[in-house]
């Protein structure tokens, strides 16, 4: 299963490097709070600080470009909306200023998987999906927290196995 349990979330948090800067820890902790709790919703964005009371309410999908457009689904976040909410809640900053994955990627510097740290961003090769790197598994593979349409929720999956190929370091974390 791609979903992780509360115990797994605690394990990921416990495995964060001791010398990881606090801003990155805050980003990872904020991301992991939503695992299994917020539905995927095409076009879903939130500027709420903390839990958004709209999440879970049956809402018409208004954004064009999805097979779910025009249908009613529980409101939640899309992948870029998830990243916006995480950075807004952990850093008071909306990466890419709400412009979606392509804009979010423009506010990053591409780095190697080896250089990746918790809090960096993971992208699909065509910038069609984004997530937040939250650590590494026992095998050293990157773990990514993202709001996934396929699982209709916030999940943590392995970087390469779930289609991610590019790592971006958000400008907010650049020295």
Task: Show which residues each predicted segment covers.
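Residue-level marker of positions within ordered structural domains that often coincide
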Residues: 36, 87-88, 136, 172
